[in-house]
């Protein structure tokens, strides 16, 4: 840690920025060349080594062999597609389902413009972005759980 650039806390300009909640990006370890030349290659090589090592140590196949003539009773997508799958499943008009999925990134693109006057990077000082994130997370988890249930319980989860 001694090779990192320490902040000069006696500097009045830095102290004024820190008092306003700003200035934390003006000191620290520079990305070039430290991160890009030394840290990133170590992480990339370590990731490859772990992946290859695990593939060599445990070469077993994942799951059973596929049979193209035996269709499962209920076809479910991968777990990360559960919320969008459930959204398309419960909205009767498919165009509305696709538009509702397109509204998610469109809504996320508007958040920086709504909070462009806020100079803070702390999430607790950015209430709109934090609220959008928390509501989106809860709705995604709710829809993901509902995707594994029958269609009549997909939205209520059988609770209501």
UniProtKB/Swiss-Prot annotation:
What Pfam families is this protein classified in? Cytochrom_B_C
Main subcellular location of this protein, as a coarse class: plastid
- In the UniProt record, which is one GO cellular component term? chloroplast thylakoid membrane
Q: Which UniProt keywords apply?
A: Chloroplast, Electron transport, Membrane, Photosynthesis, Plastid, Thylakoid, Transmembrane, Transmembrane helix, Transport
* InterPro entries given in the database record: Cyt_b/b6_C (IPR005798), Cyt_b/b6_C_sf (IPR036150), Cyt_b6/f_cplx_suIV (IPR005870), Cytochrome_b_C_euk/bac (IPR048260)
Query: Quick one: signal sequence residues?
Result: none
**What GO terms in the biological process aspect are recorded for it?**
mitochondrial electron transport, ubiquinol to cytochrome c; photosynthetic electron transport chain
Name the HAMAP family for this protein. Answer: Cytb6_f_subIV (MF_01344)
Per the record, the similarity remark reads:
Belongs to the cytochrome b family. PetD subfamily.
Q: How would you summarize the oligomeric state and partners of this protein? A: The 4 large subunits of the cytochrome b6-f complex are cytochrome b6, subunit IV (17 kDa polypeptide, petD), cytochrome f and the Rieske protein, while the 4 small subunits are petG, petL, petM and petN. The complex functions as a dimer.
Name of the protein: Cytochrome b6-f complex subunit 4
Q: Which organism is it from?
A: Pyropia yezoensis
Q: Which gene is the coding source of this polypeptide chain?
A: petD
């Amino acid at each position: 840690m001694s090779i990192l650039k320490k902040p000069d806390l006696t500097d009045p300009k830095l102290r004024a920025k820190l008092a306003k909640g700003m200035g934390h990006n003006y000191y620290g370890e520079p990305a070039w060349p430290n991160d890009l030349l030394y840290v990133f290659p170590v992480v990339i090589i370590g990731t490859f080594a772990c992946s290859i090592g695990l593939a060599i140590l445990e070469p077993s196949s994942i799951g059973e062999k596929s049979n193209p003539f035996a269709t499962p009773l209920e076809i479910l997508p991968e777990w990360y597609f559960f919320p969008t799958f459930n959204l398309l499943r419960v909205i009767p008009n498919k165009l509305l389902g696709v538009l509702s999925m397109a509204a998610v990134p469109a809504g996320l693109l508007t958040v920086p413009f709504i909070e462009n006057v806020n100079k803070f990077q702390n999430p607790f000082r950015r209430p709109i972005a934090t609220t959008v994130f928390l509501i989106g997370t809860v709705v995604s988890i709710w829809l993901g759980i509902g995707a594994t249930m029958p269609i009549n319980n997909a939205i209520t989860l059988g609770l209501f």
